[in-house]
Every structure is written in C-alpha cells, then in structure tokens.
Amino acid sequence: MTTLVGLVGWRGMVGSVLMDRMTAERDFDLIEPLFFSTSNAGGAAPAQAKNEKTLQNAYDIEQLKRCDIIITAQGGDYTTEVFPKLRAAGWNGHWIDAASTLRMKDDAVIILDPVNRPVIDKALAAGGNNWIGGNCTVSCMLMGVGALYKAGLVEWMSTQTYQAASGGGAQHMRELLTQYGTLNAEVKALLDDPKSAILEIDRKVIAKQRSLTEAETANFGVPLGGSLIPWIDKDLGNGQSREEWKGMAETNKIL
C-alpha cells in the first residue's frame, strides 16, 4: 500500500521550493500525495496529485488523520492550532514541519542529518514521529563546522547573519515587493527625467516610506522597502531577538 502523505503550505516560499525539489528527485513516484489548503479547500490539486485530485481543508482533523505522514510548511500559527488537536484525536503518524513551533519540544528532533543522523535514527527506532526542520542560519552554520565539533576541535563560536525578508514567508515577500512598486511609482516621473535632482527623488522616497499605511505594512509592521529592520521575528525583552536565541538553543539541541 502506498504511503499517504499530506502536504500543507505547499504554495508558500518554503513549500514551493520543497515541491520543486520533490518533483526533480521524483519523490512523488514513491507516495500518494494528499494536498491541503487553508484558503482554497475544494479546489483542484496541483499536477503532482494522483488519485486525490481535490484540495482538502487543512483544518479538517478527520482528513488529516488519513495521512501516514504530514509535511507542513504552513508556518507556526498553523502548527500551534492544528498539531495538538491532531495528536489529541489519536493520530500517531509522522509530522514533518518547517516551522519553529515544536523545535525545542522534548519529543521532537531537529533534522540536520549530515550532522545529527545518529540522533534521528535513534529517535526513529524508539518510535519518534515529530521531525522538525531547523533554523536556516543554524543549519548552514553546522553544515560547515559540524565535523569539527565531532572531532572536539571547537570550544565556542560566534555567528552573525542578515535575515532575509523571505524568512517571514510568502505574504511578507509580497508586501516587500509591493512596497518597492509603490516607491517606484511615487518617483517614476522624476526617474524618467534625466535633469531631475537626485536629492528630490530621495526626499520623495523617504516621505512615501514614512506615509505607508497600516495595511501596506501589515506583515512587517514597518516599511521595509528601501530600508532595514533589526529582525523579522520578535524581541524577547532580554537583550536578544528570537533569531539570536534560536542560534544558541537550537545549535546546542542539534549537537
């Protein structure tokens, strides 16, 4: 019997890359995919679908329970709402998640198999079924130095990173690109005039940035187009951003 694998969040930033990768590596040949949607239940499933041609409601616990494995890139809010309900309903399948929500739970394993494959194998043999993707900075960092840690050659390390806006997800990316379009439209006439003063263009761009509405900055909370912000997650109130905390806590858990 073919393994029934539910996919949630497959249209977002992370999910789109995953779909491309699974298609290129012919992973869909090995499974029966069941596609879920939080906004378009009843719509047509993508081309990778086989027998399950209709999008299912991603909040329908009974439909989710059909799956042997669920892969979700829908984000932390979805995991927070659905995962406990699904487990409480008696589902014991494998939950594979890109979000950070479950990473530090005792019954979850952060997946970075080139570094912690023995941990993964041990958890699988013991009946583990919560497999969580790690923070991107942590994963890239440990891929580079994991072997040095295993050899006992590293006492401590420090890492610095710029977070990409895409780390917030597809809606954050849409907001950023829309802001760029808004700023361009504000000064397009001046840009088209080779005699226009660059300082006047600069002033108009800044003024437009500062006047963006709450709706235009709903995801990031502030104008990001043409600017920088300290983080895209949150301030923990102790001098650390959540991203910095992940760099320490997740690294130690993986190791």
Q: What kind of region is each of these model predictions?
A:
Residues M1-A218:
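N-terminal Rossmann-like NAD(P) cofactor-binding subdomain of oxidoreductases
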Residues K208-L255:
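Oxyanion-binding "anion nests"
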